[in-house]
A protein has these predicted regions:
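Generic alpha-helix structural propensity
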Residues: 28, 39, 43, 60, ...
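Pre-Walker A-like glycine/lysine-rich segment at the N-terminus of P-loop NTPase domains
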Residues: 2-50
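Short, flexible segments with low predicted structural confidence
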Residues: 15-16, 36-38, 110-112, 136, ...
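Nucleotide-state sensing region of NTPase/ATPase domains
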Residues: 53-129, 133-135, 139, 144-147, ...
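Secondary-structure edge/capping motif, primarily at the C-terminal ends of alpha-helices
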Residues: 169-176
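Conserved protein kinase catalytic domain
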Residues: 45, 49, 66, 140-141, ...
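Amphipathic alpha-helical coiled-coil segments
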Residues: 147-168
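N-terminal leader/targeting segments
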Residues: 1-2, 84, 174
Length: 176
């Protein structure tokens, strides 16, 4: 059985985009993020999603999360899940070295992504209502993968097989 109750208590960003050194205590319950444009509000939300998905919703190039004047970006979080304290630590360097730790112990991306569950809803997700069926499927696939990590693996295998099948059919048509 899955336990979905968790609370993010602390978030620390070091050289994450424009957040050079930011520590947030999120233990007060209700959080309101207020600031002028380009002050890092979206970066805070993105970093939380990044910890759960190990990718940014805004870029496919992880080097872009590193502050221009730094060599490494780091995201640290403390959360409580099923009455157990858990720490997450993600660091990424311009040399593309990635370190993932859960409770101070290095771990795999698969195990890391199983700790924090988030579902991102952004203005781009308005495509759920007006966009293509493929946009709806992509959003739903991301949401299901958060709840059932094995789904992500199966989906990747399915996509590879589908691409192979399509390539095979194209070759078959060319040969006919």
């Amino acid at each position: 059985m899955y336990n979905f109750v968790m609370r993010l208590l602390e978030l620390k960003l070091t050289n994450y985009r424009n957040c050079r050194d930011l520590s947030l205590n999120l233990n007060s319950g209700k959080i309101l993020i207020i600031g002028k444009n380009a002050q890092g509000k979206t970066n805070i939300l993105e970093s939380i999603y990044f910890l759960s998905a190990l990718k940014s919703p805004r870029t496919s190039n992880n080097i872009e999360i590193i502050n221009f004047n730094a060599e490494t970006a780091e995201i640290e979080a403390e959360l409580v899940k099923a009455n157990t304290s858990v720490t997450l630590d993600y660091s990424y360097s311009k040399e593309k070295n990635r370190i993932l730790k859960v409770n101070g112990v290095k771990t795999t991306p698969k195990n890391f992504k199983q700790v924090l569950k988030t579902v991102l809803f952004s203005t781009n997700d308005l495509l759920l209502l007006r966009g293509n069926p493929s946009d709806r499927r992509d959003w739903l696939d991301r949401a299901i993968s958060q709840v059932y990590p094995a789904y992500d693996e199966r989906l990747s295998k399915y996509d590879k097989i589908r691409i192979q099948k399509n390539n095979f059919l194209k070759e078959l048509i060319k040969g006919a």
